[in-house]
């Protein structure tokens, strides 16, 4: 009705998960209404085949998110935080979708960058090494005594405020405290979408698909 002939869709999803698939279904249903339809990559880019596969998007997100978390926690560098016994946990949603490997890839990316004190977790505990219990064990075994929890989500909504930082016994904050392994557990309630450098990745993805 508005005379648009060429449609470009920029998903604001984190990855190629179930909601991205639903978007693709919706867009494809209207594809014949336009001369061209292009859908850009979500934040973490292409999924890749296994847990060891990383890409430029994952590296950029890992660096940007970690730098933001370190700064918010009051440290000059990740090394300074590590020296003070601090571990950072970035908590995603988790999924049974095949895209769950993206979380494992983000952990691989952190390891590749030498971010020894950064751990990836998920609310759903899928993949299983991202469950709250698994992450608590990993951090305790590594010897860190202070923990900072922060969402690995575009928007810090219900999951961040309740599942991560809520007062219920089954929140991550409560379970980390209840484990008795840590001297302090702090939370940072900020979504990825609030960070200008993250916004720039989405814009770059839009530009890339327009220029294809």
Predicted segments with their positions:
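Extended amphipathic ligand-handling, pore-lining, and cofactor/metal-binding catalytic surfaces
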Residues: 1-212
């Amino acid at each position: 009705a508005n005379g648009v002939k060429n449609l470009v869709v920029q998903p604001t999803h984190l990855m190629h998960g179930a909601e991205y698939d639903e978007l693709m279904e919706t867009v494809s249903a209207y594809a014949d209404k336009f001369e061209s339809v292009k859908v850009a990559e979500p934040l973490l880019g292409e999924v890749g085949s296994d847990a060891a596969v990383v890409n430029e998007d994952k590296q950029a997100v890992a660096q940007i998110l970690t730098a933001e978390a370190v700064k918010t926690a009051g440290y000059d560098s990740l090394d300074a935080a590590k020296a003070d016994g601090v571990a950072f946990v970035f908590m995603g949603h988790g999924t049974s979708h095949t895209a769950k490997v993206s979380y494992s890839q983000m952990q691989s990316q952190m390891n590749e960058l030498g971010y020894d004190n950064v751990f990836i977790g998920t609310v759903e505990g899928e993949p299983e090494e991202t469950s709250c219990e698994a992450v608590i064990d990993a951090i305790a075994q590594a010897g860190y005594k202070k923990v900072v929890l922060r969402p690995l989500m575009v928007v810090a909504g219900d999951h961040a405020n309740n599942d991560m930082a809520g007062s219920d016994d089954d929140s991550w904050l409560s379970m980390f405290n209840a484990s008795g392994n840590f001297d302090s557990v702090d939370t940072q309630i900020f979504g990825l979408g609030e960070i200008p450098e993250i916004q720039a990745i989405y814009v770059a993805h839009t530009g890339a698909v327009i220029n294809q």
